[in-house]
Amino acid sequence: MSRYKKMFQKLSFLKEGCFVPFVVIGDPSLEMSLKIIETLIENGADALELGIPFSDPLADGPIIQKASLRALYKKNTFLQCFELIENIRNKYLHLPIGILLYANLVYNYGIKNFYYQCFRSGLDSVLIADIPIEEYEPFYKIANQYNINSIFICPPDADDSLLSKISLYAKGYIYLLSRPGVTGIEKKTISLSNIFIEKIKKYNSLPLLQGFGIENPTQIQKSILSGTNGVICGSAIIDIIEKNLNKEKKMINEIKNFTSKLKKATKFVQS
């Protein structure tokens, strides 16, 4: 049984939603990145979604773009990102860990070499943000060879054709967008309709995680009540990092408190 499946089963038994933080590896440095990730895990993260820094992250808003640039400025290599992931895996054996990255990084490394490296590092899933699902077949085949779950983004206006295609390839969970566009720009986060959630579930039985604009407990509870299994939160955490670049202790303390607060919001009694 996969780590994702075990995690979702456990959370279902506990009547909790899933809280998945997103940060960019190497922001603001590899050393601090490791401390930040460990803080997230120790204060309630049920799984991790980690960004591999890229110079032109089209799906990301300004907050995450700046995080990528800070990481790239440190000249961390692709392999160093995987080494950090391996360190986390060795310490947290049962934690689901996924990465989000862009296709150029995969092509430059070689598709087969990339997925082999994911396997070696102990990764559970890969989300390639800019590969259309119609072009995913070669990635999917090799991902399956190495037991790497393929994660797909599902927008709130997805039609039957897209939902059908996602159902063919998706494994682990489905990443539901709160709204169209890029991450972290608009303050308004759409509450996904129960009708839309039920429509997705007709095509796929995978757990659903809502992302884009998640930053407070009320949003998390609304998301779970709408029928999702939990949330992914990135920009709000990275904003804490950016505001405390020269105050490391304050940064870690704020991340600790924020993570605990958001995880606590997943534990309300669901009707």
UniProtKB/Swiss-Prot annotation:
The keyword Signal does not apply. Keywords: Amino-acid biosynthesis, Aromatic amino acid biosynthesis, Lyase, Tryptophan biosynthesis. The keyword Amino-acid biosynthesis applies. Disulfide bonds: none annotated. It catalyses: (1S,2R)-1-C-(indol-3-yl)glycerol 3-phosphate + L-serine = D-glyceraldehyde 3-phosphate + L-tryptophan + H2O. One of its GO terms (molecular function) is tryptophan synthase activity. Pathway: Amino-acid biosynthesis; L-tryptophan biosynthesis; L-tryptophan from chorismate: step 5/5. The active site is at E49 (proton acceptor), D60 (proton acceptor). Its EC number is 4.2.1.20. It holds the Pfam family Trp_syntA. One of its GO terms (cellular component) is cytosol. The alpha subunit is responsible for the aldol cleavage of indoleglycerol phosphate to indole and glyceraldehyde 3-phosphate. Tetramer of two alpha and two beta chains. Belongs to the TrpA family. NCBIfam families: trpA (TIGR00262). This is Tryptophan synthase alpha chain. It comes from Buchnera aphidicola subsp. Schizaphis graminum (strain Sg). The gene is trpA.
